[in-house]
Amino acid sequence: MGKLANQVAVVTGASKGIGAGIAKALAAEGASVVVNYASSKADGERVVKEIIEKGGKAIAVQADVSKQADITRLFAETKKAYGKLNILVNNAGIYKFAPLDSITEELFHSQFNLNVLGLLLTSKEAAKLIGPDGGSIINIGSGISTMLPPNTSVYGATKASVDAITGILAKELGPRKIRVNSINPGMIETEGVHAAGFAEGDFRKRIEAQSSLGRIGQTDDISPTAVYLASTDSKYLTGETIRVTGGLL
């Protein structure tokens, strides 16, 4: 039996990238996984298919986790399918980099609505469903919150908020045996990184030069930490932020 046998996990933004990698890793350890996606049903169902083909259990549920009504429905469908919740991975998020003179209200609110408000509302609903035995909430932050590169003031502020929220919710939810921790990745090679043009060229070379390990990360560099935080291996760990950056300083 895997480390997460008989556990139920919701992973937001799990149709690709880091979220998909975490969803598959949790399922491989025995968890029943709710693969949340915002827009691409095909991508969500592809992740579910991969999990089921390897003997795991999963369903795909559409929800825009910046909207309360969608979040409520996400957890209602989780309860209907599996009857409970043990693990939440707050992975859904967006990033739009811009210098100060290009910041707009839309750029600010779109990122804060999903990366911060969405994370809070999702955590609120998850905490209602997690039972008296407790559980684990895992927030996906970013190494940018401490690296502070130029042109990331809005995105970096959302992820600094995640750092703070992680510690605060750990204190609020600790009496209910709900642990709250954060994983702050460095640059990870995902579909989004490729689409943004960061996976090749000078930007990638600069990150690789700054990395102690001399490379950017892959999704399977992040998922083992998520499994650890979801399992009883980390039963005395809460309120912590774990940087998984390949030594980016």
Functional labels for PLM-detected ranges:
Residues 128, 171-175, 235:
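Alpha-helical segment proximal to the catalytic Tyr-Lys
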